[in-house]
């Protein structure tokens, strides 16, 4: 186990631009080893082109993470299996494969379910409810979170108010299932840290 001093030396070496090639491959690419310097996960988006063109099957994601990269934690993209969540059979197969490989499912990245900060009350409610199935799927797969977008329209303060409303309602549903709701700081005002902090307040 590294001491605090060892950790600071390694961090300083990396931060100062010293080559990290001396670090083992498992330190960089993830490992189940308790001695690894870093623990990382593989985002399914890394394979989205291969999956979309049929080169890689979504169900092979956990196997690829473990066998090709020695990574034992993964993050799913809802778009890559959105048409298969109608029943529990597919999710059960996903879970069985990940469990069999010793891979932990961490979260589901969610897009194309509507704007959680939509100015229209009905559309905003629909967007919130569209995310429920992903909270349910995340719970079933053993994830700790889903990642969402805080998309909205209008003036700065109005978007903050609308996004806060949608996220608050979705967070309430997530809390009932012990699933966190994480906002991606990507696109629109969600890239503004001050704005996003205001949404959370």
What residues fall within each predicted segment?
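N-terminal pre-domain/capping segments
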Residues: 2-140, 158-168, 175
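Acidic/histidine-rich catalytic cores of soluble enzymes
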Residues: 73-74, 164-201
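Conserved beta-strand edge residues that scaffold enzyme active sites
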Residues: 79-80, 111-113, 145, 152-153, ...
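Active-site groove signature of glycoside hydrolases
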Residues: 138-156, 177, 182-186
